[in-house]
Amino acid sequence: MRSNYIVIEGLEGAGKTTARNVVVETLEQLGIREMIFTREPGGTQLAEKLRSLVLDIKSVGDEVITEKAEVLMFYAARVQLVETVIKPALAKGTWVIGDRHDLSTQAYQGGGRGVDQTMLATLRDAVLGDFRPDLTLYLDVTPEVGLKRARARGELDRIEQESFDFFNRTRARYLELAAQDASIRTIDATQSLECVMADIRQTVTTWVKEQGA
């Protein structure tokens, strides 16, 4: 069966946009042309509104978004994107390149926020079932490096303004999950840009050839 859903994950400032460009270039060199791009949260009209609510520091004024409310908004945006965009594209044989997916919630909310892992797993199974990316590229970067890059881009969103401790917990959970799942490939994003790009090219090329896609 052809596998064609690739997701790019990582902390803020890990280089996901650059990685996406390298993935696209690599796939094109392998003769793959039909691709769409998604981001989470977002990617549909409803999901983009939810993105604004959950990430815009000013979206709800002084009201505090609770941890469970945050999780539910992320999943509402995700399931809308999966059901209305990603699954239909995959059914047509189109490749989908995603900026974040469920691993982000497991790492950020499960690791960073400390939300109960059993609750997250139950919710994920309820709304996504066995739907998973075929390949996830996790760009591993320390919070110190990643946030320095993110701050250089300009104003930070609500999540990006969290503490170093939050991002250290998030990174630790990412690494833990990556070690448990062979479909998640870890890329050392603290290397030079040239080395990171080379690692991504090699990883994607090898994986595609292994799939016979």
Swiss-Prot record:
Pfam families: Thymidylate_kin. The keyword Flavoprotein does not apply. One of its GO terms (cellular component) is cytosol. GO terms for biological process: dTDP biosynthetic process; dTTP biosynthetic process; dUDP biosynthetic process. It catalyses: dTMP + ATP = dTDP + ADP. Keywords: ATP-binding, Kinase, Nucleotide biosynthesis, Nucleotide-binding, Transferase. One of its GO terms (molecular function) is dTMP kinase activity. InterPro entries: P-loop_NTPase, Thymidylate_kin-like_dom, Thymidylate_kin_CS, Thymidylate_kinase. It is an enzyme of class 2 (transferase). Its EC number is 2.7.4.9. SUPFAM superfamilies: P-loop containing nucleoside triphosphate hydrolases (SSF52540). Signal peptide: none annotated. It comes from the Bacteria. ATP binds at residues 10-17. Belongs to the thymidylate kinase family. Phosphorylation of dTMP to form dTDP in both de novo and salvage pathways of dTTP synthesis. PANTHER family: THYMIDYLATE KINASE, UMP-CMP KINASE 2, MITOCHONDRIAL. This is Thymidylate kinase.
